[in-house]
Amino acid sequence: MNNKWDFDDENDRLVAYLPSFTYNDSVKLKEDINNAVRGKRIVYTLSEHTGALKDLGFSVEAETSGFFEGEKAIILTQYDKEERKNSKTKTENEEVLNRVREDSKQISQPCLYPVGLVQDRDLKSLAALYKKVFPKYPTNIFDPEALKKAAESDYLFAAVKNGGEVIAAASAMKTGYRSAEITDCAVKPDYRGNQLLHYLVLDLEEECRKEGINHIFSITRARSTGMNMTVKRLGYQYEGTLINNCIITSGFEDMNVWSQALK
């Protein structure tokens, strides 16, 4: 498994995926800590490397089961900016989780609209949906050409359409470690309450199975009752909250990690 580094200036963070943690990785991380000021550093790694990262000032914030080809990823973080370290919505986050945990509803009715993978002809409508739903977002989902490039590389986009218009969408971002993240979830306001994301996630799970992906996870806005409820009802397990993780809607927001094995 290869290590990957993402210097994400847009979200004032470094995200590193380190299934191995060599001397060179340690030096690279130390140099970044000593020479750069970042709001947040995030490292996904295996459990045997957590001690070395804690020695560098990192602490465990969450985990995601099966991330590294079936092995659990421990998510450790380190902050240079105190305001980034402290949640602004801790009480609200806990209230959302409590509501979600108490829910026992099962979704059984069929979807009212067709669900399927996005085609090139859908990209303008997909971008228009994202512009309508999100004033801010951590990646460029507002440009049809950027969406096309994503779909040609590591992303599977699925959509619910009505009369040719994309009214709900989500994607699965392939990690390269036989796991994938459910992300970019949006529903046009007029169509909310129809459980459309439920069917989108099911569709993406099936597409991931076809590609040999064994584990799937979602990093979900901690304040969003709807999306947390969606993945919980689909059998995902809560595995922690990432504080002020990325810019979305209202600025930096806390994100919940949910995961499950694909059977």
Outline where the language-model segments fall:
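A short, internal acetyl-CoA/4′-phosphopantetheine-binding micro-motif in the GNAT/acyltransferase core
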Residues: D12-N24, C185-G193, T220-R221
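Conserved acetyl-CoA-binding loop-helix of GNAT-fold acetyltransferases
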Residues: T22-N34, V187, G193-K210, M229, ...
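N-terminal charged segments
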Residues: M1-V37, T50-G51, E83
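A short beta-loop-alpha structural element at the N-terminal edge
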Residues: C111-L126
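Conserved catalytic-core motifs of GNAT/GCN5-like acyltransferases
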Residues: V43-T45, S59-I74, Q237-F252
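A conserved beta-strand-loop-helix scaffold within acyl/acetyltransferase catalytic domains
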Residues: N2-R13, S125-P189
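Conserved active-site tyrosine of GNAT-family acetyltransferases
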Residues: A52-F58, T230-K232
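Conserved GNAT acetyl-CoA-binding A-motif
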Residues: A36-S47, C208-T220
